[in-house]
A protein has these predicted regions:
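A penicillin-recognizing enzyme superfamily signal
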Residues: 1-14, 18, 71, 118-284
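Short active-site loop at a secondary-structure junction
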Residues: 1-21, 29, 33-41, 67, ...
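Extracellular glycan-interaction surfaces
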Residues: 24
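Short polybasic/polar patches that bind polyanions
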Residues: 27, 86, 98, 132
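Secondary-structure transition/capping motifs at alpha-helix termini
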Residues: 27-35, 103-105, 133-138, 231
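Conserved catalytic neighborhood of penicillin-recognizing serine enzymes
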Residues: 31-93, 109, 137, 149-181
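Mid-domain, small-residue-enriched loop/turn segments at the edges of structured enzyme/sensor domains
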Residues: 51-57, 89-126
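Proline/serine/threonine-rich low-complexity "mucin-like" segments in extracytoplasmic/periplasmic regions
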Residues: 277-319
């Protein structure tokens, strides 16, 4: 049977683990975590897909109502993320993915926010490590260097000591906060068991052919990916097992529990650390119409608004 290094060569659709790329692009271009979007499902974007309608669904067709970007991240609200990608532009999402270290071909199309690209665990780990390092990107390597018994350097991984500041730390602080809410309130809750600050994202591809949890503490990033191959090597729906035998395998099932179990040991002797200081914006109130009290009767006629005054009259926000 052929052998392969699944960490570096095993690839599958990233699903929602790729979603944080779009908020990063948005944060770089003036968007904020308190912006609100329609999180109901399904949602149709007329003409958005090369002139054709684009229909997006949430997992289980769940209606989340009006959500901000923090909740959209915590709950993997596809419809909210799709609207954000429409505003930000899929080309900016693809650019951020490349700068994070994702070498896969992230297409310049609106669906790239939903994680349709095929990625390796190494690529995702590099991306989440860059977020954990507050925008400082490193070159992935397995062995940094080798010296012989005389202390002579016989091997050094290309770029092993190279670090580049790819992103503004303030942008990464906001992204880290949003991802920490996946663990606090979302599908990554099992990761709370490591007993130290944690952030990350669950991901499940179409038809449950792959399931992921990508996460980090202040000092360590780890990715768990799970997929199932058929007799001819093709990826197929993951067969439920263990305590999930009567349900389905998603990123919030075995992957996050495996991640938590591993991290409890791997991070045990590392300083707990803290995520960067970040004060989340106060939620914006939802606008509601109010009635204007009637004017008292007057004998003088009310002057008509000019065309310019009508154009400048306040209007209710559409969202």
């Amino acid at each position: 049977r052929a052998r392969a290094h699944n960490a570096t060569r095993g690839a599958a659709q990233g699903g929602s683990t790729s979603q944080p790329v779009t908020p990063l692009a948005g944060l770089e271009h003036g968007h904020t975590l308190d912006e609100r979007f329609d999180g109901n499902s399904p949602k149709t974007f007329p003409g958005a897909n090369n002139g054709e309608d684009w229909k997006v669904r949430n997992f289980g067709d769940h209606d989340w109502g009006n959500v901000d970007l923090t909740e959209a991240t915590a709950q993997s609200v596809n419809t909210a993320y799709a609207e954000l990608n429409l505003e930000v532009g899929p080309e900016k999402t693809a650019d951020v993915a490349a700068r994070l270290g994702i070498k896969a071909d992230v297409g310049v199309n609106l669906a790239n926010v939903l994680g349709d690209a095929t990625v390796t665990p190494l690529e995702l780990t590099n991306a989440y490590a860059t977020i954990a390092a507050q925008g400082m990107k490193a070159t992935p390597h397995i062995v940094a260097s080798v010296t012989d018994s005389r202390g002579n350097l016989v091997y050094e991984a290309p770029g092993a000591d190279k670090r580049t500041q790819e992103f503004d730390p303030e942008v990464m602080a906001a992204a880290t906060y949003a991802l920490s809410q996946v663990v606090e309130t979302g599908s990554g809750k099992p990761a709370q068991a490591i007993g130290r600050p944690a952030a990350g994202k669950t991901g499940t591809s179409t038809d449950n052919k792959s399931a992921w949890f990508a996460g980090f503490t202040p000092g360590l990033a780890t990715v768990v990916g799970l997929y199932q191959s058929g007799p001819n090597g093709e990826q197929e729906q993951i067969t439920p097992f263990g305590k999930w035998v009567d349900s389905e395998i998603t990123g919030g099932s075995w992957p996050v529990e495996a991640w938590t179990s591993y991290m409890q040991t791997a991070a045990a002797n590392l300083p707990a650390g803290e995520f960067p200081d970040y004060t989340p914006p106060k939620p914006k109130p939802t606008e509601t119409p109010t009635e204007t009290p009637p004017e008292p009767p007057t004998e003088e006629p009310t002057p008509e608004l000019s065309h310019r005054e009508v154009a400048q009259a306040p209007r209710r926000a559409h969202r």
